[in-house]
Amino acid sequence: MPFTNHDGAVLWLTGLPAAGKTTLAQNLHRLLEDVGATSIILDGDELRKARTVPLGYTKEDRDEAVHGAGLEAMQKALDGAIVIVAMVSPFRDARRAVRLRVKDAGFHFIEVFLDTPIEICIERDPKGLYGKALNGELSNMTGINDPYEAPEKPEVIIGWEHSPHSAARYLMEWINPLVRESTSQQVNKSIER
């Protein structure tokens, strides 16, 4: 896996709702902190809440949410952070557009697909959204009455059978060259100041 000497990186965690994206992001963030790397989590739900103009759940709204998250991730990566985006981002074309923008800006982009079967997501259902969608109380629910387009060639696939901690450790090993680069650049920036 070739890494060049650019600041920052974007790890884009995608998967069905309740696939484990936020939990993996939190576990990975802790591991990165433990080795002195600067990381920031951008959670799709939190980003939606923070918007001044709320978005709905049409394809256009979802694509706009992905676009906005991508722009914010690039802004954070400018400071040399490893930005972990945990977001359903159900449409390939929107993820592909963010990938191209991030790479064109000179940052690493690593798509991580949490391959969790919908049956497991329905069992987890921490917000009760699958239950509402299955009862006809909620429309536009990704995986039930709205599509989720799995990545065709993600850099990393995490299977649902892994614990959040083991999945984070696996991902940490995979991005280790980037972590070394990030912490080295942080030391160099400190010396320059």
Give the predicted meaning of each segment:
Residues 10, 41, 109-111, 155-157:
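Conserved beta-strand scaffold positions in the cores of enzyme catalytic domains, especially
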Residues 50, 54-56, 73-134, 140, ...:
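ATP-dependent NMP and nucleoside kinases share a basic, alpha-helical "lid"
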Residues 3-30:
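Walker A (P-loop) phosphate-binding motif
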Residues 61, 65-69, 94, 137-140, ...:
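Helical mechanochemical/support elements of P-loop NTPase systems and associated helical scaffolds
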Residues 115-118, 123-172, 176-193:
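Small-molecule kinase domains that catalyze NTP-dependent phosphoryl transfer to phosphate-bearing small molecules
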Residues 19, 26-78:
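Conserved substrate/cofactor phosphate-moiety recognition/catalytic segment
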Residues 8-12, 38, 82-84:
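Residue-level preference for the first positions of well-ordered beta-strands
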